[in-house]
């Protein structure tokens, strides 16, 4: 298998995984009361934003502590 096909296969697998997780989250949210939906959506948004922050900027806790306490 060529390197390009490996990249395409791994990208497809990763997208399939995210699609499965998104569908699971959506089905879970649709089956709970409205007050719980707000809490779940907030929690999922927080986890997702921390995940994205960690990918691009490193540790979110380090960023927050640097913002609060200044440089180490």
Curated annotation (Swiss-Prot):
Keyword Transport attached: no
Keywords per UniProt: Membrane, Transmembrane, Transmembrane helix
Compartment(s): Membrane
Segments passing through the bilayer: 6-26, 38-58
Cellular component terms (Gene Ontology): membrane
Membrane topology: Multi-pass membrane protein
Protein name: Putative transmembrane protein DDB_G0272126
Record organism: Dictyostelium discoideum (Social amoeba)
Species classification: Eukaryota, Amoebozoa, Evosea, Eumycetozoa, Dictyostelia
């Amino acid at each position: 298998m060529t390197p390009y096909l490996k990249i395409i296969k791994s990208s497809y697998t990763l997208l399939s995984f995210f699609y499965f997780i998104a569908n699971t989250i959506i089905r879970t949210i649709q089956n709970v009361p409205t007050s719980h939906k707000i809490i779940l959506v907030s929690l999922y948004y927080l986890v997702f934003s921390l995940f994205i922050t960690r990918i691009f900027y490193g540790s979110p806790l380090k960023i927050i502590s640097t913002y609060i306490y200044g440089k180490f």
